[in-house]
C-alpha cells in the first residue's frame, strides 16, 4: 500500500508537474508497470480546431474530443498578460436554455458530460499553449463557467477538482477555483447538491443570479421555475457555513 501510494504520487508529479508526453518517460517505473498504466490511462488531449484572440488578450479554443464532439475553453489574461484564468467546459451541450448563454444558442440538449480527464486536459492543453511550464506565464485560476452546468456533472467535476488541488498534481489552492451554478436544487447522496458540494468540492461558488426578480429571472433562466431563488438561499447559506468562502 505504501509503495502504491508512492507510485501514485510519482505518476501525478510526472503528468501534472513534469508534463511528460509519453509514459515511456517514467524512467523509475518498470516495463510491466508502464504497460499497465498505458492500458489504464491516456495522455491524449483534445485537438485544437480553432483559436480566436481578442484585442484584450483573451484566447478562445474550439476543441475536438475523441468522439469528434466539440467544446470550448477560454483563457482570460490579467492586465500584465502573464497570469490567466481558464474557463472550463464540463459537457457537450446543455438543456438549461439560459437566454444569455452562447451554448444555448448552439444546443438545447445535453449531448453528454465530459469525463474528469476531458475536463483536466483542457488545463494541460492551455498550459502547453502558453508554455506555463517554463515561462513567467501562468494559469493561476480555474473557473467552471464554460459549456455545461457543473452541478449536472458533479461526480466528474469533483474528480477534476481533486486532481487540480492535489499537491502532487496541479496544486491549485481552494481559493483559486470557482464553480458556477445556475442554482440546481437536486439531491446528491440524499442531501441537497449544493450542501454536498460544500464538502466534496470546497472551492468558491458563483451563483448565476442575473436577476433578483423571480419573474424576470424565469424569462432569462427557465430553471428558476423549478428551483426558485427563495428555495436556494437556505442551501447557499449552508455552503457558506461549511466552507467559510464567500459566494459570488
Stretches with model-predicted labels:
Residues 21, 96, 214:
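Glycine-centered loop/turn positions within well-structured domains
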Residues 78-125:
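Canonical Radical SAM [4Fe-4S] cluster-binding loop centered on the CxxxCxxC motif
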Residues 127-248:
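Conserved AdoMet/S-adenosylmethionine-binding subsite of the radical SAM
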Residues 54, 89-90, 180, 208:
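Short linear Ser/Thr-Pro motifs
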Residues 1-84:
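Flexible, acidic/Gly-rich N-terminal and inter-domain linker regions that tether
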Residues 18, 103-108, 212-214:
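A short, flexible beta-alpha/helix-coil linker loop
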